[in-house]
Design a protein with these regions (language model features):
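Intrinsically disordered terminal and processing segments
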Residues: 1-61, 65-126
Length: 126
């Protein structure tokens, strides 16, 4: 009876671990190959612009404030599933500093960086 219980627990733990790993890595290849387009800020009107990106656990929505054809603020409306404030802050700071979404990804958070950039790209499309 004890061996059976141990076997059931081992199988349950193995199944749970496999499902968790699948959930965390599903869509990773597609996200790594995601293209970030160009944004022409001269074509963007002043004001707050909302944009979203929807894919697996990286879905998010941001609001981008533009003043005099410059990005002045970026706010998260709906964050990615496993959000890290230091990642979003670093991405948004780079975008504001460079006035471009063509930035280097945050080390260890390449896919999350791309997800935020796609939302910003969506917000700034004319």
């Amino acid at each position: 009876m004890r061996k059976l219980l141990l076997l059931v627990l081992t199988l349950t733990l193995t199944l749970f671990s496999s499902c968790s790993l699948f959930t965390l890595t599903r869509g990773l290849d597609k996200m790594m190959n995601l293209h970030i387009g160009e944004v022409d800020l001269t074509a963007v009107d002043d004001g707050d612009h909302r944009g979203s990106f929807a894919f697996e656990r990286w879905s998010n929505t941001v609001e981008v404030t533009v003043h005099n054809h410059a990005i002045t603020a970026i706010r998260i409306i709906k964050d990615v599933k496993f959000a890290k404030a230091e990642v979003s802050s670093a991405v948004f700071e780079q975008v504001k500093t460079r006035q471009s979404i063509q930035i280097d990804a945050i080390s260890g958070s390449t896919v999350t960086t791309k997800a935020y950039l796609k939302s910003i790209e969506s917000a700034l499309q004319p």
